[in-house]
């Protein structure tokens, strides 16, 4: 009996340790709730930033994500922020897995974490009805260019080339 308990305890501790290692090895998306837009905006103020809204439930988004991964590999200086803006909050593990498959694991990642997603969209842009994908090109001076739908990455590259280089 004692041997069974010790074995069960060892197996349990092994599973806990393995799960802990997995969590430490993979960055989870930051929960995007009320006030997150203001925080994200202030953290990137004064720095050219590409903010890409996508979703696990958006077919064109999933097809497009590997292209963003290639662009990030090509332009490691690009400040890319990804926001999973699904109407219903998605599992952080599913979001993370999709980003890893697309080569975007090193990009800053957020995920809508409020079931009242209309409120989150309104904080971002009162005129945005929630269509995905959507990309915002935010210049150092705060001026913003919105690219609705699948982004033309040639346009994004051209915009990046026109931005002043700044330290991360």
Predicted regions and their residues:
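Bacterial N-terminal signal peptides that target proteins for export
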Residues: 1-9
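Bacterial N-terminal signal peptides
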Residues: 8-16
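Sec/Tat signal peptide C-region and signal peptidase I cleavage site
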Residues: 19-23
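A short beta-strand-turn-helix
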Residues: 27-49
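Aromatic-flanked redox-active Cys/Sec active sites in thiol-based oxidoreductases
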Residues: 52-58, 85
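Structural microenvironment flanking redox-active thiols in thiol-disulfide oxidoreductases
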Residues: 63-102, 117-120
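Short, internal strand/loop/helix patches
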Residues: 99-132
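Thiol-/selenol-based redox modules, centered on thioredoxin-like
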Residues: 131-168
């Amino acid at each position: 009996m004692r041997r069974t308990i010790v074995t069960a305890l060892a197996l349990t501790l092994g599973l806990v340790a393995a799960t802990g290692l997995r969590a430490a090895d993979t960055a989870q998306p930051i929960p995007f709730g009320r006030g997150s837009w203001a925080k994200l905006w202030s953290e990137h103020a004064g720095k050219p930033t590409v903010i890409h809204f996508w979703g696990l439930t958006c077919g064109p988004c999933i097809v497009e994500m590997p292209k963003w991964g290639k662009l990030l590999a090509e332009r490691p200086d690009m400040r890319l922020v990804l926001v999973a803006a699904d109407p219903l909050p998605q599992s952080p593990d599913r979001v993370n897995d999709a980003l890893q498959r697309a080569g975007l694991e090193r990009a800053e990642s957020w995920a809508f974490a409020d079931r009242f997603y209309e409120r989150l969209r309104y904080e971002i842009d009162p005129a945005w009805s929630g269509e995905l994908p959507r990309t915002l090109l935010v210049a150092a001076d705060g001026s913003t260019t919105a690219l609705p739908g699948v982004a033309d990455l040639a346009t994004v590259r051209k915009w990046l080339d026109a931005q002043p280089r700044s330290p991360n």
